[in-house]
Amino acid sequence: MSSDPPAKTQHCSFCGIEQGRDTPLIAGIEGQICEACVRLAEQVVANWGRKRSMAELHGNVPKPEDIKRHLDQYVIGQELAKEILSVAVYNHYKRLRHESREILGLAGSDTEVQVGKSNILMIGPTGTGKTLLASTLARIVGVPFVVADATTLTQAGYVGDDVENILVRLLEAADGSVERAEWGIVYIDEVDKLAKSPEMAINTRDISGEGVQQALLRFVEGSQVKVAARGRRREGSGGGEEVTIDTRNILFIAGGAFPGLERHVEKRIGPPRGEIGFHAPVQDAKRPLLEELLAEIQPEDLRRFGLIPEFIGRFPVIAPLEPLDEAAFVRILTEPRDALVRQYQKLFAYEGVELVFTEPAIRRIAARTIERDTGARGLRSIIEHILRRPMFEIPSQSDVRQCVVDADTVDGKAPVTLVRAEEEAGGARLAAGEV
């Protein structure tokens, strides 16, 4: 009677540990691996991914002139702001690029000098392009980008969005990659609404003004923050997982209209007005323009407006934006790569219809936008109102070839002109002398 040969003892092909009740092995075609080696391999692969992400991010940073040239394709005017932003973004990502090269061992380390980051504060009237500038910068550099509305932020524990949610959304925008999120750009809109209210009662907790400024300080300056890993599609697994995000390298850009800020500037730089009488010096009646005042903004003006000194200090780069005039709105409608007129012309082209705006119509749209005081974002609502009826009717009318908008159409005195196929053919024959 022959007995079966003893079973061959299995060992982990990586560490050599023997298979046992407490040491199961995962078998492959030519080997086995234990749980401890699986976890170690996971860490190694994750480190490879981290190095790949950093290698992608530390690629060549566009030079300031290249950044501004790209901004020029999408944002009309605002030359000073675009120059300031181009330099600030270049310096920020140049610093990160060199730091990442040191981490990857691609460059020598200089521990004596640590270059700090310079967050940006954009100041200008509503609709002058603050959000567009920030989003375009993120697209140029190729980093994750989120917009946070300062008016919805509250201190943790109160109804509303707490500051940590900004980082959760940034992680989602980075497709769950913590490394990419830590190189992202956060734009905080309407930050002027966080100014301290002078009429706030002494015993009333300011949960959405100064309180939010205080809550933002540690994020903006740089700290280790734990957030829920909702966005971790690449690396994450189960719900409830938390990840730590280092905000030291996140570029924060804040923006706001700051209505009335120019009065603080004018009071600071203007001549004294206290002298009266026959021998008092004659004051120049010409007051500075708004854009001239915005270009002279100093931290003390922001403090008088209601921002706390600690918050102001975290935004050393100030980029003023000029009010837009009619000529600027005309250019915004027609010149950028994704100009509104071109967007609607493309929509109509899907239906085989040519959309035409006459020059007087373009000027009237610009003038109406100034009358409404809504800034560039008000242009779309005006065009939507003008084209609402044709956009409703044209898909059902296959013979329409052209849609013409003139000044009377903009003013509501006449409907848009629809040129149909038979009219177009008749006009062509008339021009050729056939009719």
Curated annotation (Swiss-Prot):
Keyword Transmembrane (UniProt): no
SMART domains in UniProt: AAA, ClpB_D2-small, zf-C4_ClpX
InterPro entries reported in the protein's UniProt record: AAA+_ATPase, ATP-dep_Clp_protease_ClpX, ATPase_AAA_core, Clp_ATPase_C, Clp_protease_ATP-bd_su_ClpX, ClpX_bact, P-loop_NTPase, Znf_CppX_C4
Keyword match Phosphoprotein: no
GO molecular function: ATP binding; ATP hydrolysis activity; ATP-dependent protein folding chaperone; protein dimerization activity; unfolded protein binding; zinc ion binding
Keywords noted in UniProt: ATP-binding, Chaperone, Metal-binding, Nucleotide-binding, Zinc
Binding locations of Zn(2+): 12, 15, 34, 37
Residues the entry annotates as binding ATP: 125-132
GO biological processes: proteolysis involved in protein catabolic process
Stored PROSITE patterns: CLPX_ZB
Domain of life: Bacteria
Gene3D superfamilies according to UniProt: 1.10.8.60, ClpX chaperone, C4-type zinc finger domain, P-loop containing nucleotide triphosphate hydrolases
Annotated ranges, domain ClpX-type ZB: 1-53
SUPFAM superfamilies the record matches: Glucocorticoid receptor-like (DNA-binding domain), P-loop containing nucleoside triphosphate hydrolases
Family to which the UniProt record says this protein belongs: Belongs to the ClpX chaperone family.
Record's subunit section: Component of the ClpX-ClpP complex. Forms a hexameric ring that, in the presence of ATP, binds to fourteen ClpP subunits assembled into a disk-like structure with a central cavity, resembling the structure of eukaryotic proteasomes.
Purpose of the protein: ATP-dependent specificity component of the Clp protease. It directs the protease to specific substrates. Can perform chaperone functions in the absence of ClpP.
PANTHER family xrefs: ATP-DEPENDENT CLP PROTEASE ATP-BINDING SUBUNIT CLPX-LIKE, MITOCHONDRIAL, ATP-DEPENDENT CLP PROTEASE ATP-BINDING SUBUNIT CLPX-LIKE, MITOCHONDRIAL-RELATED
Record-given protein name: ATP-dependent Clp protease ATP-binding subunit ClpX 3
Lineage: Bacteria, Pseudomonadati, Pseudomonadota, Gammaproteobacteria, Methylococcales
